[in-house]
Amino acid sequence: MNLSFSSPPLLAELEVGHHLYWHLGKFTVHGQVLIASWIAIALILTVVILGTRQLQREPAGLQNFVEYALEFVQSIARAQIGEKNFRPWVPYVGTLFLFIFVSNWMGNLFPWKLIPLPEGELASPTNDINTTAGLALLTSIMYFVAGISKRGLSYFKKYIEPTPILLPINVLEDFTKPLSLSFRLFGNILAEELVIAVLVLLVPLFIPVPVMVLFLFTGAIQALIFSTLSAAYIGEALEGHGGGDHRD
């Protein structure tokens, strides 16, 4: 009697760090990250446009969802930046939250395998360090914009207080705080997608589903943490080092 066994799945088939490179002049970019980012942005814009196309006094359907999302983002900005200063920063905080939230969920829900690429494969934009570092750099820029818009060039006096010796440390602190957020987001999302990929290879039926549900929850939490702390840094810049009363 002949017994034949199918070969076990090869974990070596999982590719990490394999990219589709686009050459734009003198620059080389990760093409699959841009494609995935465009998909995330398109999804967000589609929902927002459809939800606000015909506004009703009594919201329903997508309008209700969009208004709830707006109120949620406003509550984050108000709590971290303060009642007096939060409104101009709602678009930025909301954009951060929605982009990270949708990107994280896309990593678990979107059928990336259905979109073949010449090299590499599509995945969540936030599992690439370039995306998360770019978001951190953007938050750092907004941090300085907030401080300068509030107090002008006198904002930079805080870097030599209480003594000029602390100048390098104070400058480094303002860049490392959002940068630490980028590494946390990148590490969590990359680990989640690798775990799901391994489970799908080993047990491809129902066992990965509860894990995917858990990762949907943690993806939402990561978006909340990044946007909340970004708003907190902006609030700190508006009130100065030491926190002040920006949450009152």
Swiss-Prot record:
Matches recorded under Pfam families: ATP-synt_A
Record's subcellular location: Cellular thylakoid membrane
GO cellular component, one term: proton-transporting ATP synthase complex
Entry keyword set: ATP synthesis, CF(0), Hydrogen ion transport, Ion transport, Membrane, Thylakoid, Transmembrane, Transmembrane helix, Transport
Gene Ontology MF annotations: proton-transporting ATP synthase activity, rotational mechanism
Transmembrane segments: 31-51, 90-110, 129-149, 195-215, 216-236
Topology in the lipid bilayer: Multi-pass membrane protein
Cited InterPro entries: ATP_syn_F0_a_bact/chloroplast (IPR045082), ATP_synth_F0_asu (IPR000568), ATP_synth_F0_asu_AS (IPR023011), F0_ATP_A_sf (IPR035908)
Coarse class of the protein's main subcellular location: membrane
Gene3D superfamilies, sorted: ATP synthase, F0 complex, subunit A (1.20.120.220)
Similarity field: Belongs to the ATPase A chain family.
NCBIfam families, alphabetized: ATP_synt_6_or_A (TIGR01131)
PANTHER family: ATP SYNTHASE SUBUNIT A, CHLOROPLASTIC (PTHR42823:SF3)
Record function comment: Key component of the proton channel; it plays a direct role in the translocation of protons across the membrane.
Subunit details: F-type ATPases have 2 components, CF(1) - the catalytic core - and CF(0) - the membrane proton channel. CF(1) has five subunits: alpha(3), beta(3), gamma(1), delta(1), epsilon(1). CF(0) has four main subunits: a, b, b' and c.
Protein name: ATP synthase subunit a
Organism: Synechococcus sp. (strain JA-2-3B'a(2-13))
